[in-house]
């Protein structure tokens, strides 16, 4: 794109039109710019437009944003993105112009160009842009001399961005080369501008300097502190060790001085606090990483920070300062210099002057509780409050307890008693004191290793529960003091394993009652408490503490209240309520009396969310709830299946007909579950869906593939006769061939193939086997992966145990005569020992045993070595310790908070396919192995011990002897 008057007019008009509120000119302009972006020198032309003073600010700002985004996508595009990169000659011109243009721009445009410069720096600095740092330093020094702090701050902001990588990237030689270059060139100019600005602040402050003078100076110091953090993050540089006294002296001054001219306004106070918070980050880093070098400054900083915290108000605008300052004291408390806190009454004073004020509820907390219950729960129950005052203050106590556990326990216990006494004196006025006491107990409890159980030294849990928590839970008014109710429910949830079962059973009706609370937090906490109680394991036993019979007396009321709670404003898609529904349905006895209202309630919600799927976690638990209800109700009473179909089919058909992308994988999994529960013959509704499965269009979205495979397996299992009609099996195998050809879907292809082998007669599949083997062997030659190799071993094993070694060898030989020996030697033997999972190990071990004991080609004397090596692999497989083979699956994996519909596939745990053991009659593959080899050897005495001695590893020979002894079988 050539830079001329015509280009200027074209681009400026386009950028102006992108700001239009009218859709048509806006879209036309966006398309024109998108097309122009493919031309060489487009980025350069846009940058020149940004610098054109004749163009209005609004248009130039739009151009600056476009320039930044253009660089993001095209400076260094991913190799497979298909986006054409900016050419090197254009890059060099942009790098030559951008610094000077950024510094001369207005603040809004300067901000965009600084970000654009950072994009370039991320890829090119310093190696491919050696001129950048000298140019920044020269401009910084010139701007400082001129007192131009707009430019100073622009340069420091840019430097802060390009140096930021040193604070988060892993230590590598390349990173340290870059860091050394930056330190060698920038550490001295940084110190110079920091000290110069500091003297300007001192001068302005002493003469009553006005906010307009002080504001850019304080912003400059904050930026210097962020750069200091990045440059000091990896190691303590020699330069900063030599100049530590100057830096620490200034840091201490800003933490201990007041600046009334700025602090009298909220904006000015925020500016000062941001600098102080950045300083606290730096000294906290020094105490953690450079403790020895920093120790001379430690006492003064601890004293200054403590004093500062006493004066920091509860205003949310001061939260960042409060949390970073408390973090510093926490780091000191766990360091070797913790003796600073050993003095008389020090811990008591910290508790009273720092911890309690920061743990106590604020008006802002109450507002979040009432106005944004999801955010409140995330902070309070789910731990996203990691940087809130409440959490950080409790972390300080935990830090102190590292070395002074007895003193901390005594002080906090007394403080809890004081708070509770205050509440008792006037409950309606002092309810926040009780909330504070409960919060302290819950937050300072420690989780025991390897489980959800928690413990605390602050209180006797059962005593505290009976006297402090229980009265709240037994309150007849579920809507009074909702924050206290929520705190009490949280306490019960946290200490659920401590509450004896008989006591907890008396509480269940109270929890059911709290589901009717109007507060979204309270009914969410009640649901969460019930859900977590149902997961409690009985100590010393494998099962859960609470079973179906425990829920029966109040099950109907529980389900009614859960569904009613979903009608409260803003709880229509409450994930905690839906998760509780899912958990209860997974435990309770599902009679027809319960199943009817539940399926009605769930399908009503399902039809509603189909209109606008927006909460992936809620929707996942909704589908899990449907799946568990269908599974458990129909296991108990198969006659319910038709009623469930009547209820569910309208929603499932809506998902399919409207192509609701987010729900298609769930819909296919539910349909698979319904197909599996049916008895032959399947209704026409299902067969219509089966025909949809055969359409290539259905398989185009990768996220649908696992669910479609699951559904196809269900049809192969339940309607094998229908599947083989009208050339349908050929279409199914076409799907298999497409899936197995790709490493990303080959496992899914094997699921289909294995299901065909398990459910169709050999006479039906025989005509297709040459094509199947050809597809598999082609894949072996082209893209061999460990996953594919294991899947193929399992498939060959399944074929053998279902249809016999003769048919296995015969069908393989249609591809190439006598291929079986090559497959055994080069593929089966090396990959057999990779198999994991108890059922898979049994299947492959038994199949391999039958292969060497029944296959003529392997029993031939010329194949003795092959026979021995295969036996060696079998012994390796069956001798491996059980824990190496497979890990226990959790009952139900937790759904991640960031689960989304863009994920490839989200499995429904409760609609999972039941794995059938194809070898139910064989209990022990080890016994089968030695018995089979023993029988074989008895027919040819003396032959096999020699083969074993020559071909088995010594460890496997020993293992085989041990197995023979264990099962009383000999090898003659």
UniProtKB/Swiss-Prot annotation:
Quaternary data: Binds with high affinity to importin-alpha only in the presence of RanGTP.
What are the subcellular locations of this protein? Cytoplasm; Nucleus
Please give the positions of the paired cysteines in each disulfide bond: none
Q: Which residues form the Importin N-terminal domain?
A: 29-104
Q: In terms of domain of life, where is this protein from?
A: Eukaryota
What SMART domains does the record tag this protein with? IBN_N
Q: Which GO terms describe its molecular function?
A: small GTPase binding
One Pfam entry name: IBN_N
> What is the similarity comment for this entry?
Belongs to the XPO2/CSE1 family.
Keywords for the protein's UniProt record, in alphabetical order: Cytoplasm, Nucleus, Protein transport, Transport
Official protein name in the record: Exportin-2
Q: What does this protein do?
A: Export receptor for importin alpha. Mediates importin-alpha re-export from the nucleus to the cytoplasm after import substrates have been released into the nucleoplasm.
Q: What is its main location?
A: cytoplasm
Q: Which GO terms describe its biological process?
A: intracellular protein transport
Output the Gene Ontology cellular-component terms.
Answer: cytoplasm; nucleus; plasmodesma
């Amino acid at each position: 794109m050539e830079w001329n008057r015509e280009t200027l007019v074209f681009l400026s008009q386009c950028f102006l039109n992108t700001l239009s509120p009218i859709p048509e000119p806006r879209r036309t302009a966006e398309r024109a710019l998108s097309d122009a972006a493919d031309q060489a020198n487009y980025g350069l032309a846009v940058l020149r437009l940004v610098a054109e003073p004749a163009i209005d600010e609004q248009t130039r700002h739009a151009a600056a944003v476009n320039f930044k985004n253009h660089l993001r996508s095209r400076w260094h595009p991913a190799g497979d993105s298909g986006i054409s990169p900016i050419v090197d000659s254009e890059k060099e011109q942009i790098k030559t112009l951008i610094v000077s243009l950024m510094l001369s721009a207005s603040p809004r445009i300067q901000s965009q160009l600084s970000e654009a410069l950072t994009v370039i720096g991320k890829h090119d600095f310093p190696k491919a842009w050696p001129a950048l740092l000298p140019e920044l330093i020269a401009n910084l020094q010139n701007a400082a001399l001129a007192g131009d702090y707009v430019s100073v701050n622009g340069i420091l902001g840019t430097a802060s961005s390009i140096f930021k990588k040193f604070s988060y990237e892993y230590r590598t030689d390349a990173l340290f080369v870059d860091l050394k270059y930056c330190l060698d060139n920038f550490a001295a100019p940084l110190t110079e501008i920091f000290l110069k600005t500091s003297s300007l602040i001192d001068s302005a402050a002493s003469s009553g300097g006005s906010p307009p003078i002080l504001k850019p100076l304080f912003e400059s110091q904050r930026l210097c502190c962020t750069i200091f953090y990045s440059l000091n993050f990896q190691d303590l540089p020699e330069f900063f060790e030599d100049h530590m006294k100057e830096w620490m002296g200034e840091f201490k001054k800003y933490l201990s001085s007041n600046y009334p001219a700025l602090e009298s306004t909220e904006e000015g106070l925020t500016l000062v606090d941001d600098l102080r918070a950045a300083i606290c980050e730096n000294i906290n880093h020094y105490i953690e990483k450079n403790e020895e070098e920093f120790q001379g400054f430690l006492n003064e900083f601890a004293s200054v920070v403590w004093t500062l915290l006493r004066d920091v108000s509860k205003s949310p605008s001061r939260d960042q300062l409060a949390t970073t300052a408390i973090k510093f004291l926490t780091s000191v408390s766990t360091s070797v210099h913790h003796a600073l806190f050993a003095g008389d009454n020090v811990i008591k004073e910290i508790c009273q002057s720092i911890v309690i004020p920061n743990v106590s509820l604020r008006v802002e907390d109450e507002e979040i509780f009432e106005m944004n219950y999801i955010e409140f729960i995330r902070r309070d129950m789910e731990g996203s409050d990691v940087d809130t005052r409440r959490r950080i203050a409790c972390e300080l106590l935990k830090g102190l307890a590292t070395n002074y556990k007895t003193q901390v326990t005594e002080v906090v216990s007394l403080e809890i008693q004081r708070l509770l006494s205050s509440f008792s004196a006037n409950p309606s006025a002092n309810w926040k004191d009780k909330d504070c006491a409960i919060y302290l107990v819950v937050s300072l409890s420690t989780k025991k290793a390897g489980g959800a159980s928690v413990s605390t030294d602050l209180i006797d849990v059962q005593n505290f529960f009976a006297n402090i928590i229980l009265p709240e839970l037994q309150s007849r008014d579920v809507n009074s003091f909702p924050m206290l109710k929520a705190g009490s429910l949280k306490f019960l949830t946290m200490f659920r394993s401590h509450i004896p079962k008989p006591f907890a059973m008396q509480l269940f009706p109270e929890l059911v009652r709290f589901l009717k609370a109007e507060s979204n937090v309270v009914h969410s906490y009640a649901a969460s408490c019930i859900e977590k109680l149902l997961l409690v394991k009985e100590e010393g036993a494998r099962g859960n503490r609470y079973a179906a019979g425990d829920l029966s007396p109040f099950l109907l009321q529980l389900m009614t209240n859960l569904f009613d709670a979903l009608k409260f404003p803003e709880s229509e898609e409450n994930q905690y309520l839906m998760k509780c529904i899912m958990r209860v349905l997974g435990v309770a006895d599902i009679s027809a009396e319960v199943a009817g209202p539940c399926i009605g309630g769930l399908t009503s919600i399902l039809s509603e969310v189909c209109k606008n799927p927006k909460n992936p976690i809620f929707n996942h638990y909704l589908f899990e709830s449907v799946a568990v209800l269908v599974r458990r109700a129909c296991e108990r009473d198969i006659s319910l299946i038709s009623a469930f179909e009547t209820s569910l089919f309208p929603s499932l058909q809506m998902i399919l007909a409207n192509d609701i992308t987010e729900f298609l994988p769930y819909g296919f999994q539910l349909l698979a579950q319904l197909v599996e529960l049916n008895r032959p013959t399947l209704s026409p509704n299902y067969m219509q869906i089966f025909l949809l499965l055969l359409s290539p269009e259905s398989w185009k979205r990768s996220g649908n593939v696992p669910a479609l495979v699951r559904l196809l397996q269900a049809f192969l299992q339940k309607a094998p006769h229908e599947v083989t009609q009208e050339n349908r099996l050929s279409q199914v195998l076409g799907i298999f061939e497409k899936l197995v050809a790709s490493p990303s879907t080959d496992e899914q292809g094997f699921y289909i193939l294995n299901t065909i082998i398990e459910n169709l007669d050999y006479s039906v599949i025989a005509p297709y086997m040459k094509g199947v083997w050809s597809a598999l062997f082609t894949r072996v030659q082209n893209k061999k992966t460990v996953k594919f190799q294991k899947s193929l071993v399992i498939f060959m094993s399944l074929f053998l145990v279902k249809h016999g070694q003769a048919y296995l060898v015969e069908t393989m030989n249609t591809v190439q005569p006598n291929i079986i020996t090559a497959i055994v030697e080069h593929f089966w033997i090396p990959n057999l020992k990779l198999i994991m999972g108890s059922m898979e190990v049994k299947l492959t071990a038994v199949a391999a045993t039958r292969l060497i004991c029944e296959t003529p080609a392997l029993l031939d004397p010329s194949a003795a070595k092959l026979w021995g090596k295969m036996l060696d692999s079998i012994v390796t497989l069956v001798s491996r310790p059980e824990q190496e083979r497979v890990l226990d699956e959790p009952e139900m994996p937790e759904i991640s908070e960031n689960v989304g519909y863009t994920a490839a596939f989200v499995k429904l745990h409760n609609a999972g396919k039941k794995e059938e053991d194809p070898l139910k009659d064989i209990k022990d593959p080890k016994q089968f192995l030695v018995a089979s080899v023993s029988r074989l050897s008895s027919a040819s005495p003396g032959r096999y011990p020699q083969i074993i001695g020559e071909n088995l590893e010594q460890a496997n020979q020993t293992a085989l002897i041990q197995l023979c002894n264990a099962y009383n079988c000999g090898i003659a």
